[in-house]
Amino acid sequence: MTTTAETITRVLVPDRQRADFVDALFGLSFPLQLEPCVFAVASELSSDYHGGYWAFQSLGNGGFYMAPDVDRGFEVSCENGFEGTLSSDALGITACLYAYSHLSFGEGAFAEVCAEQYHLLREYALD
């Protein structure tokens, strides 16, 4: 039996659709919990990160991530010992994975959404 795995696609969420898009996925928990957590993780991972505009990406498998909208790398240092340079996209994916994992240990529907988003984004990252 042969199975063919399809590549997970990503699409930039247009500026005019950003608010509605994240509201449909996360509700008020996006601006109150998820977004600040992602920004904090990015700051912890990279002393090069000092804020800025983030691009929102919708994944073909239902996942979502956001990444700094700049064309440069970020020096990172992680608690697991990794030190190196990540692209802005890779920093965003990493920060979102950390945030989803952390927030998935809460209670209620938002924690479940974060757990699901973690696995969808991880699937994309490993693709």
Which residue ranges define each predicted feature?
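Short runs of predominantly hydrophobic/aromatic residues within well-ordered alpha helices
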Residues: 18, 50-53, 90-96
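Compact, glycine/acidic-enriched structural inserts
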Residues: 76-114
